[in-house]
Amino acid sequence: MALRLSFMGTPDFAVPVLHALLNAGHDIVAVYSQPPRPAGRRGLQLVSSPVQNAAEAKSIPVFTPQSLKTAEEQARFAALSVDAAVVVAYGILLPKAILEAPRFGCFNAHASLLPRWRGAAPIQRAIMAGDKETGMMIMQMNEGLDTGPIALSRSIAITENITAAELSDKLSHMGAELIVEALSALEKGQLTLTPQSLEGVSYASKIKKEETQIDWTKSAEVIHKYICALSPYPGCWCTMTIGGKPERVKILGSRLATGDSLGIGRIEAGHLIIHCGQGRIEITHLQRAGSRILDSSTFLRGANISAVF
């Protein structure tokens, strides 16, 4: 038996979940996504979210309210008379009236092993912290920030050089499988909900602009984790002296190199191996402003780097 659902999500991360629900035969009567955003150099063009584009391609009605706090929006949502709402990286607060409208409630696919990394940036924070594993959890939502009881979970290892983009892709597809499994159990009356532990709670705050600038006085290990966590968006950056002129460059790939540091900011000749506060790091992919992403060997053929800071 198919469930009557609403789907609420915004970025690319949520699209595989939407597709999985459709492939499982569920009736998605409406999709909610954040409003189109200005794009382009002048911000004159409005661009729809990946979820909105995916839903419209399947001829599913899409709603893009700025907020769900108004009585009008809450009445419109309640009128859908859905069995459940599936929420994946929607980015808009769900008030109590929205949470309680579906027959079985609202279910969120969250990219962490709760209660660790509640909040907006769980994938990035897990990599930054050097966590050895993370995962996806399906929880029934309540009014707290990612505090609802857990229906299903699955873990995955965080390898040394995996980027946020690569990990996000793996977790997105994992979440798609889990939500279909959870809804199948829900239909059969077999879904078990387990309260979250009161221990091990941590919060994954949004990434701040000042966190994206590389501080070469930190250890190579810490810098590498930040580069992986912020690749490709928003991307770490540093200033390089190229052809005698300072230039801001995005650093989008790295790996740890052997050897002790012989001086912060020192660059090894013929390589993009940079000495840090402790240890050395090899830059593998980087991007100058207005240019495409290059591997380090290609980059070095067209750029004479004399300093980094």
UniProtKB/Swiss-Prot annotation:
A molecular function (GO) term: methionyl-tRNA formyltransferase activity
Keyword Protein biosynthesis in record: yes
A GO CC annotation given for this chain: cytosol
Entry keyword set: Protein biosynthesis, Transferase
Enzymatic class: transferase
InterPro entries: Fmt, Formyl_trans_C, Formyl_transf_N, Formyl_transf_N_sf, Formyl_transferase-like_C_sf, GART_AS, Met-tRNA-FMT_C, Met-tRNA-FMT_N
Sites where the protein binds (6S)-5,6,7,8-tetrahydrofolate: 112-115
Family listed: Belongs to the Fmt family.
Reported function: Attaches a formyl group to the free amino group of methionyl-tRNA(fMet). The formyl group appears to play a dual role in the initiator identity of N-formylmethionyl-tRNA by promoting its recognition by IF2 and preventing the misappropriation of this tRNA by the elongation apparatus.
HAMAP family according to UniProt: Formyl_trans
Protein name per Swiss-Prot or TrEMBL: Methionyl-tRNA formyltransferase
Gene: fmt
